[in-house]
């Protein structure tokens, strides 16, 4: 670890502290979510005039780790962050109104990707919603086909994991 690593960690921590949602989360969760992103270079940090304004991180999961993540968002190990090709946004922090710019930059960097996230509202931290996003160059028909495939695979895996009984 060097000075730039700690500067990066400090910038991201500062953004977390300024986010209404993230500032309530523990240091342990910050470490679990941020350190693997830095070590695997799976993040984007936007800086404006020397000040961090937005950050996101992602993990590329296999189906097994995707199910594990949905069951417990703090469960991923460092190695699991790069276990497959099913991209999940782990953190999205833009406390100063730069969310749209971050979205645009991610679409430019990954124009052909399908990305999912579990979104939480500050007043409902125990209930998350899975959201889907597509890269800027991915046409709607192809994106929908991929969305549907991912959804079907995930639903089947979750059904098998929880042993749901069909009535």
Swiss-Prot record:
Which key words tag this protein in UniProt? Acyltransferase, Cytolysis, Cytoplasm, Hemolysis, Transferase
- Which organism's genome codes for this protein? Mannheimia haemolytica (Pasteurella haemolytica)
Localisation per UniProt entry: Cytoplasm
Q: What does this protein do, in the record's words?
A: Involved in fatty acylation of the protoxin (LktA) at two internal lysine residues, thereby converting it to the active toxin.
Q: Which domain of life is it from?
A: Bacteria
What is the name of this protein? Leukotoxin-activating lysine-acyltransferase LktC serotype A11
Q: Which GO terms describe its molecular function?
A: acyltransferase activity
Reactions performed catalytically: a fatty acyl-[ACP] + L-lysyl-[protein] = N(6)-(fatty acyl)-L-lysyl-[protein] + holo-[ACP] + H(+)
Catalytic activity, EC: 2.3.1.-
């Amino acid at each position: 670890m060097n000075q730039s690593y700690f500067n990066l960690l400090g910038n991201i921590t500062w953004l977390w502290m300024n986010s209404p949602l993230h500032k309530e989360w523990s240091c342990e969760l910050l470490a679990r979510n941020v350190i693997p992103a830095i070590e695997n270079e799976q993040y984007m940090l936007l800086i404006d005039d020397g000040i961090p304004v937005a950050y996101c991180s992602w993990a590329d999961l296999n189906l097994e780790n995707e199910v594990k993540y949905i069951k417990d968002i703090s469960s991923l190990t460092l190695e699991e962050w790069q276990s497959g090709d099913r991209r999940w946004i782990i953190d999205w922090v833009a406390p100063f109104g730069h969310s749209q710019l971050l979205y645009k930059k991610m679409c430019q960097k990954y124009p052909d990707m399908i990305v999912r996230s579990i979104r939480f509202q500050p007043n409902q931290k125990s209930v998350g919603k899975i959201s889907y996003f597509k890269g800027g160059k991915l046409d709607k028909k192809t994106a929908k086909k991929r969305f549907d495939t991912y959804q079907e695979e995930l639903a089947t895996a979750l059904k098998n994991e929880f042993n749901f009984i069909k009535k």
